[in-house]
């Protein structure tokens, strides 16, 4: 959950492609873009403003201004999202007029747009303005109902250090936030529809850790028979010396590095076909002790054996292209051709 808004993170597509070669059915989802789209639409913003107004806040002038412009945001959000999805390019000139979208503090930081985009760069200029519009709404959320909110990361500060689990553990066991509720509503729909035996959560960055723990916690509370595995870049770099057993209140297994062989063996283990000592590059809890198991006789797969990444199930036409900074590289990152190369461990 919560990576880039302009494209799905490729890890799940790689794993799904591999599982296809083994005849193992799987379903994938990008909860980050789904939560973003559930929040940033007319109905979602209406509920958001209602939730904010239902409580007393000590609001700074910027948040007061955004609340005063509530109707302007609610009446323009659907068009902005469609534009950023590339489905409503015709409103670029209207956005660039600076009379269509409400503006708050994010616009104070904008560089000289004419210098940055010239007279003809209407699409990129409009994307930048629309991004600032979303940034203002994001700032309102952070100042009120959810201080951990971020568009491409969530509660990143809690996940930056793996030295201690205390702060993150306390946050996970605190009351669910407004965004948590949206996330878990969507997650529950997938669980009810798919009825999985195993849920694998990719956590590439610190800003994905909190939401993965929330999902694991929800499964343990509502569907304890479902097993939960976590893997990805964060585990590979930060959890190689894992020792805190509290982590396994949310996950059953944590795998390291290339995920294909560990997940295949894990599925066989869950199906009763392999013993726990057969697991590969895997942390789990045995008799209350965090145990790393890596004595498997089964080798990793060669590149030509991994299959083709499969993006089925991802909302490929609904990702949004944003330009946060007046920097040509940001446009290339969002709109340029992505030529995915597997160099090592899926990166």
What are these regions (language model features)?
Residues 296-312:
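C-terminal beta-strand edge segments of enzyme domains
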Residues 3-5, 11, 15-18, 25-44, ...:
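Glycine-rich beta-alpha loop elements in corrinoid/cobalamin-binding modules
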Residues 278-279, 289, 300-305, 335-337, ...:
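A generic structural signal for well-ordered coil/turn residues at beta-strand boundaries
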Residues 6-7, 310:
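Solvent-exposed, flexible loop/coil residues
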Residues 309-347:
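Radical SAM [4Fe-4S] cluster-binding motif and immediate context
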């Amino acid at each position: 959950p919560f990576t880039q808004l302009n494209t799905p993170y490729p890890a799940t597509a790689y794993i799904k492609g591999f599982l296809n070669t083994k005849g193992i059915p799987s379903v994938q989802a990008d909860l980050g873009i789904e939560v973003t789209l559930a929040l940033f639409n007319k109905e979602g913003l209406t509920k958001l403003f209602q939730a904010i107004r239902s409580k007393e806040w000590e609001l700074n002038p910027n948040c007061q201004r955004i609340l005063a412009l509530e109707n302007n945001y609610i009446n323009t959000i659907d068009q902005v999202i469609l534009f950023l999805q590339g489905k409503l390019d015709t409103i670029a000139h209207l956005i660039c007029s600076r009379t269509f979208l409400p503006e708050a503090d994010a616009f104070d930081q904008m560089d000289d747009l004419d210098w940055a985009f010239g007279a003809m760069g209407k699409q990129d200029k409009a994307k930048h303005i629309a991004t600032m519009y979303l940034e203002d709404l994001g700032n309102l959320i952070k100042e009120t109902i959810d201080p951990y909110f971020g568009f491409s990361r969530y509660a990143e500060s809690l996940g930056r250090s793996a030295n201690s689990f205390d702060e993150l553990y306390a946050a996970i066991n605190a009351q669910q936030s407004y965004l948590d509720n949206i996330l878990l509503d969507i997650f529950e729909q997938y669980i009810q529809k798919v009825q999985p035996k195993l849920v694998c959560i990719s956590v590439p960055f610190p800003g994905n850790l909190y939401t993965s723990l929330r999902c694991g916690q929800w499964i343990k509370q509502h569907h304890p028979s479902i097993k939960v595995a976590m893997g990805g870049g964060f585990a590979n770099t930060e959890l190689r010396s894992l020792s805190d057993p509290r982590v396994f209140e949310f996950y059953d297994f944590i795998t390291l590095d290339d995920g294909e062989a560990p997940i295949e063996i894990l599925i066989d283990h869950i199906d009763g076909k392999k013993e726990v000592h057969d697991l590969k590059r895997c942390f789990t809890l045995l008799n209350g002790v965090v145990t790393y198991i890596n004595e498997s006789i089964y080798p990793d797969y060669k590149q030509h054996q991994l299959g083709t990444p499969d993006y089925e199930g991802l909302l490929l036409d609904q990702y949004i292209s944003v330009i946060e900074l007046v920097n040509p590289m940001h446009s290339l990152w969002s709109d340029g051709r992505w030529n995915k190369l597997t160099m090592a461990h899926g990166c």
